[in-house]
């Protein structure tokens, strides 16, 4: 992105530490033979080369994230990822068909949203890409919660947001920037809805809340790097005070939930690196933290 990335963009490159998951010793590690399969519906009456480029960039980014995801977490079943024309900007997971649908209109909407605040097509495409990947991982969380019957507490939509952000900021390529782009999309959407009646009954938190929840986790992960979020007034000091604890607690919770579903290939790689017995290596892997 260019120098006009906005007040919540990362000032530094993402950390490259590997995401691994710990769980209970004695659990059987999952076999990651399940796949994500992609399908693309043809767009009808589509015009606009800029939106087409944005959709292509976002599609490529989703493919990259899927490859990284498969190294870390086993899928409960094959999941079909469908890029489709839906008639409105949306994304969703269908628990009956095990399909994640990303609507072209949603990607277009992200591009148009960021076009109003960012200069240059590269910056706009990168922001739309980040927001798309962020919401895609949100839908992946729904699939994992469904398939592995994860005993989450609280609202599932909030838990899905947490999973998306935590996965991105813990070693995913360009993960910090993508998480912050997702946060910024919530902020911009909230601004567009200013003056409208809020739907407090919706399963999702309000866009303003999703914005602050996301940047709180980003800040809590690396407060020294993102201290500027407090300086420029983006993150209120009273909320920032709780963010490190929030990150640690939620990070540990997702480690516990997903530990038994650590991808087997990731386990094998770690086991070879330890140069010890398989059982000892397995215990070491399961103790490894997200950090």
Question: Where are the regions a protein language model picked out?
Answer:
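An active-site-proximal "capping" alpha-helix that borders the catalytic cofactor pocket
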Residues: 153-172
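Short alpha-helix carrying the canonical HExxH Zn2+-binding catalytic motif
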Residues: 125-145
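Auxiliary, metal-adjacent structural segments of Zn-dependent hydrolase domains
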Residues: 55-119, 125-130
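Hydrophobic or amphipathic, alpha-helical segments that drive membrane association/targeting
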Residues: 2-84, 290-291
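Active-site/pore-lining binding-face segments in mid-to-C-terminal subdomains
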Residues: 169-221
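Alpha-helical scaffolds flanking conserved acidic
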Residues: 129-134, 156-158, 180
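Pan-zinc metallopeptidase signature
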Residues: 13, 17-39, 198-291
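Acidic helix-start/capping segments at beta-turn-to-alpha-helix junctions
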Residues: 78-92, 161-162, 177-193
């Amino acid at each position: 992105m260019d120098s006009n990335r906005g007040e919540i963009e990362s000032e530094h490159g993402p950390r490259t530490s590997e995401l691994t998951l710990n769980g209970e010793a004695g659990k059987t590690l999952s076999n990651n033979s399940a796949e994500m399969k992609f399908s693309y519906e043809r767009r009808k009456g589509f015009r606009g080369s800029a939106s087409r480029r944005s959709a292509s960039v976002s599609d490529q980014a989703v493919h990259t994230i899927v490859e990284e995801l498969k190294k870390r977490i086993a899928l409960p079943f094959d999941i079909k990822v469908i890029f489709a024309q839906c008639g409105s900007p949306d994304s969703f997971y269908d628990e009956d068909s095990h399909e994640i649908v990303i609507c072209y209109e949603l990607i277009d909407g992200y591009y148009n949203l960021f076009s109003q605040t960012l200069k240059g097509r590269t910056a706009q495409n990168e922001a739309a890409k980040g927001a798309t990947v962020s919401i895609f991982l949100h839908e992946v969380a729904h699939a994992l919660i469904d398939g592995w019957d994860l005993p989450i507490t609280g609202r599932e939509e909030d838990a899905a947001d947490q999973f998306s952000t935590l996965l991105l900021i813990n070693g995913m390529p360009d993960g910090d920037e993508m998480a912050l782009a997702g946060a910024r999309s919530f902020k911009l959407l909230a601004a567009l809805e200013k003056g409208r009646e809020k739907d407090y009954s919706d399963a999702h938190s309000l866009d303003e809340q999703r914005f602050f929840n996301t940047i709180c986790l980003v800040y809590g992960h690396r407060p020294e790097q993102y201290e500027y979020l407090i300086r420029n007034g983006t993150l209120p000091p009273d909320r920032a005070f709780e963010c490190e604890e929030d990150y640690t607690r939620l990070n540990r919770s997702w480690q516990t939930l997903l530990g038994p579903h650590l991808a087997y290939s990731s386990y094998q790689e770690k086991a070879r690196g330890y140069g010890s017995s398989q059982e000892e290596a397995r215990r070491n892997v399961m103790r490894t933290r997200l950090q």
